[in-house]
């Protein structure tokens, strides 16, 4: 039995070792298919990252499929049951690095658009693709740079589906209609280095920092809302000392991270952190990295179209959640766009033996096509 168009394209994409920020020819495969449909292609290379913007039509609304061709490293190959770049089907599951995150989605997007354009060559509005090879890496030269370019020429995305693996047990059981923001602080608390036997002529920055860190960890930053849980504060990294047992360190470095809801702003969180640090009379340096702002699509044509499309295919409406980490949707949402994430089951992403249900890929293709039918037919 021959492969379906979705499965065949997925296998072709998965056979390419596009470990971030490499693309390994994946985008060329997609571009050829889209050019045949009348898409105008614009390749955007920024340093080590390859991106492309493809558009069919010049009218509003502008609907976009967004995704990435890069994948995370495989890890120890001896822990894989198959070659991660030789897509293999076992018991109805397609195994390969990127099967779920997110080359499977890319194949579904392309085939869905091929079918839709074949049925509706004079469709309403415009369809576009925003594809990058820098989602799994530092996300500096990928989607964010393409969005900047589009905004500079006032080309604004109205609605966007990001193909990130949103589902939990079967495709379409969960869609993400928002994401929390991410704010990282790099804090250096300064003390005075000395001998542990003479603490009176030294100043231990670890001891000094602990009460402030305790307060930061126990502070209620907000109460969340109907769509987001309360803002969370975590310390993922802390480093101080020389490694010797008889030396009081001169500094301690603490990295902390907020995952914050729409109930808090970056300025508010930064101000409250500084107030707590100053209250404890610390000598410190503090640098901030805004990894992404929260976004939410709680109403609108896109949300309605996605919910109805999933219901048509699954005979069950999806659950709307904002859980999980950040995605490139945060950059697109800054344009004022409606953004929804709909993709495969995420149970094996970034793990060895990453896989996706072959039937789910067919259903996801149908869902994407139905979204287009609902919006642009």
Curated annotation (Swiss-Prot):
Homodimer. Belongs to the peptidase M20A family. DapE subfamily. One of its GO terms (molecular function) is succinyl-diaminopimelate desuccinylase activity. Pathway: Amino-acid biosynthesis; L-lysine biosynthesis via DAP pathway; LL-2,6-diaminopimelate from (S)-tetrahydrodipicolinate (succinylase route): step 3/3. It holds the Pfam family Peptidase_M20. The keyword Hydrolase applies. PANTHER family: ACETYLORNITHINE DEACETYLASE, N-ACETYL-L-CITRULLINE DEACETYLASE. InterPro entries: ArgE/DapE_CS, Bact_exopeptidase_dim_dom, DapE_proteobac, Peptidase_M20, Peptidase_M20_dimer, Peptidase_M20A. NCBIfam families: dapE_proteo, PRK13009.1. SUPFAM superfamilies: Bacterial exopeptidase dimerisation domain (SSF55031), Zn-dependent exopeptidases (SSF53187). This is Succinyl-diaminopimelate desuccinylase. Zn(2+) 1 binds at residues 68, 101, 164. Keywords: Amino-acid biosynthesis, Cobalt, Diaminopimelate biosynthesis, Hydrolase, Lysine biosynthesis, Metal-binding, Zinc. Its EC number is 3.5.1.18. PROSITE patterns: ARGE_DAPE_CPG2_2. Binds 2 Zn(2+) or Co(2+) ions per subunit. One of its GO terms (biological process) is diaminopimelate biosynthetic process. Catalyzes the hydrolysis of N-succinyl-L,L-diaminopimelic acid (SDAP), forming succinate and LL-2,6-diaminopimelate (DAP), an intermediate involved in the bacterial biosynthesis of lysine and meso-diaminopimelic acid, an essential component of bacterial cell walls. It catalyses: N-succinyl-(2S,6S)-2,6-diaminopimelate + H2O = (2S,6S)-2,6-diaminopimelate + succinate. The active site is at residues 70, 135. Zn(2+) 2 binds at residues 101, 136, 350. Its cofactor is Zn(2+); Co(2+). It comes from Aliivibrio fischeri (strain MJ11).
């Amino acid at each position: 039995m021959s492969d379906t168009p979705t499965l065949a394209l997925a296998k072709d994409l998965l056979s390419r070792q596009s470990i971030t920020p490499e693309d390994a020819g994946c985008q060329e495969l997609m571009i050829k298919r889209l050019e045949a449909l009348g898409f105008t292609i614009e390749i955007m290379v920024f340093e080590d990252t390859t991106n492309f913007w493809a558009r069919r039509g010049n009218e509003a609304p502008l609907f976009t499929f967004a995704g990435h061709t890069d994948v995370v490293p495989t890890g120890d190959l001896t822990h894989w049951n198959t070659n991660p770049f030789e897509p293999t089907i076992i018991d109805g599951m397609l195994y390969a690095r990127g099967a779920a995150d997110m080359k499977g989605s890319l194949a579904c997007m392309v085939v869905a658009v091929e079918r839709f354009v074949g049925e509706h060559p004079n469709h309403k509005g415009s369809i576009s693709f925003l594809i990058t090879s820098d989602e799994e890496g530092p996300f500096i030269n990928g989607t964010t740079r393409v969005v900047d370019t589009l905004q500079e020429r006032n080309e604004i995305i109205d609605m966007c589906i990001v193909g990130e693996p949103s589902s939990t047990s079967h495709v379409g059981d969960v869609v993400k209609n928002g994401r929390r923001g991410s704010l990282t602080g790099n804090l250096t608390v300064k003390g005075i280095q000395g001998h542990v036997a003479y603490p009176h002529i030294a100043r231990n920055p670890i001891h000094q920092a602990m009460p402030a860190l305790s307060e930061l960890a126990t502070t209620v930053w907000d109460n969340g809302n109907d769509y987001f849980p309360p803002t969370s504060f975590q310390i993922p990294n802390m480093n101080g000392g020389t490694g010797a047992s008889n030396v009081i360190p001169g500094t301690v470095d603490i990295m902390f991270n907020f995952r914050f809801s729409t109930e808090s702003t970056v300025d508010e969180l930064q101000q409250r952190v500084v107030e707590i640090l100053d209250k404890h009379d610390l000598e410190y340096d503090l640098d901030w990295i805004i990894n992404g702002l929260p976004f939410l699509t709680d109403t609108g044509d896109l949300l309605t179209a996605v919910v109805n499309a999933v219901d048509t295919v699954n005979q069950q409406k999806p659950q709307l959640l904002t859980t999980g980490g950040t995605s490139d949707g945060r950059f697109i949402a800054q344009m004022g766009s409606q953004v929804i994430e709909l993709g495969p089951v995420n149970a094996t992403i970034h793990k060895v033996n990453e896989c996706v249900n072959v039937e789910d890929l067919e259903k996801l293709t149908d869902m994407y096509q139905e979204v287009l039918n609902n919006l642009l037919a």
